[in-house]
């Protein structure tokens, strides 16, 4: 039987981005990809990202995160999920004991989180990575503000010349001149996610700059598909826009699930502020993992 059988979890969301928070700090178990897929397949625990807490390794940190996508793959960063973890570690009656600030370890590095209100948190996502080999890309591009990539006819592409950024996970941001909702991202997204230019696959965003301090964004999330919100994609969109001088270094990013405020500081760190919501708590039924043994 899986050690996750009958284990407690929290179903949350950050702007509609479906998050499950699982506390394994009292366990040595590491979630297997097939277990993550089984959790995602159950309507009660469906997620875009599964945020798993482990005991910290680095002194002075509060927990170590492993982040799973719906397809069982792992991700280096999830801003919306990190805010949900911060809420749980502060306010949940079982998990909650953190203060106004906490520091989490992730594959992307240390994430500092600050409480803004009972439901809103600011996450320091760290500096963006902009070199082609840091993103990574499969071939050199000296200027990643716009790279040679398009989809559609050569003389009339549907999308072209994205900016590429890593926020601990790879992002390609295509700037468009009309509402991103008018594009068939459900069809285009998986083609671009798996493009040979992205050896680790990529998150694909369509960004419409509507003002110097506002971006409208839609995201195809690597390993998860269409999502109502993606915090790291919002960070990448602001960085990509600011590098092209399409916006300033602070903007409100509007996603289908709501707004995030993104600021790219003079210290090169990108900070994201947004809400969290607890939907319910539950326990995994043992039968859920029957096929994941």
Curated annotation (Swiss-Prot):
Location relative to the cell: Cytoplasm
GO biological process, any: lysine biosynthetic process via diaminopimelate
Positions of substrate binding: 17, 49, 69, 79-80, 169, 203, 221-222, 231-232
GO cellular component: cytosol
Active site: 78, 230
Presence of keyword Amino-acid biosynthesis: yes
EC annotation from Swiss-Prot or TrEMBL: 5.1.1.7
Record pathway: Amino-acid biosynthesis; L-lysine biosynthesis via DAP pathway; DL-2,6-diaminopimelate from LL-2,6-diaminopimelate: step 1/1
Catalytic activity: (2S,6S)-2,6-diaminopimelate = meso-2,6-diaminopimelate
Record keywords, A-Z: Amino-acid biosynthesis, Cytoplasm, Isomerase, Lysine biosynthesis
Predominant subcellular localization, coarse grouping: cytoplasm
MF-aspect GO terms: diaminopimelate epimerase activity
Residue numbers marked as site, Could be important to modulate the pK values of the two catalytic cysteine residues: 171, 221
Keyword field contains Membrane: no
SUPFAM superfamilies for this protein: Diaminopimelate epimerase-like
InterPro entries: DAP_epimerase_AS, DAP_epimerase_DapF
Family: Belongs to the diaminopimelate epimerase family.
Xref: HAMAP family: DAP_epimerase (MF_00197)
Entry function: Catalyzes the stereoinversion of LL-2,6-diaminopimelate (L,L-DAP) to meso-diaminopimelate (meso-DAP), a precursor of L-lysine and an essential component of the bacterial peptidoglycan.
Subunit structure: Homodimer.
Name under which the protein is recorded: Diaminopimelate epimerase
Species per Swiss-Prot/TrEMBL record: Methylobacterium sp. (strain 4-46)
Name of the encoding gene: dapF
């Amino acid at each position: 039987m899986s050690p996750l059988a009958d284990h407690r979890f929290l179903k949350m969301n950050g702007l509609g981005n479906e998050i499950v928070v699982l506390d394994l700090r009292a366990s040595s178990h590491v979630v297997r990809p097939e277990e993550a897929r089984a959790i995602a397949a159950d309507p009660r625990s469906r997620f875009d990202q599964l945020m798993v807490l482990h005991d910290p390794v680095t002194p002075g940190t509060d927990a170590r995160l492993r982040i799973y996508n719906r397809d069982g793959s792992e991700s280096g960063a999830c801003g919306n999920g990190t805010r949900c973890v911060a809420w749980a570690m502060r306010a949940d009656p079982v998990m909650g004991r953190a203060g106004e600030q906490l520091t989490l370890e992730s594959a992307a590095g240390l994430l500092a989180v600050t409480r803004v209100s009972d439901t809103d948190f600011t996450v320091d996502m760290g500096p963006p990575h902009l070199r082609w080999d840091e993103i990574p890309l499969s071939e050199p591009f000296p200027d990643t503000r716009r790279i040679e990539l398009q989809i559609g006819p050569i003389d009339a592409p549907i999308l072209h010349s994205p900016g590429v950024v890593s926020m601990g996970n790879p992002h390609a941001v295509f700037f468009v001149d009309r509402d991103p909702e008018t594009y068939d991202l459900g069809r285009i997204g998986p083609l671009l996610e798996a493009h040979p230019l992205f050896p680790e696959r990529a998150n694909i965003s369509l960004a419409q700059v509507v003002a110097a301090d506002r971006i409208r964004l839609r995201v195809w999330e690597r390993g998860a598909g269409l999502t109502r919100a993606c915090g790291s994609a919002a960070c990448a969109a602001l960085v990509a826009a600011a590098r092209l001088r399409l916006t300033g270094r602070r903007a409100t990013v509007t996603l289908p699930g709501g707004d995030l405020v993104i600021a790219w500081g003079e210290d090169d760190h990108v900070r994201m502020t947004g809400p969290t919501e607890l939907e319910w708590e539950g326990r995994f039924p043992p039968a859920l993992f029957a096929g994941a043994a």
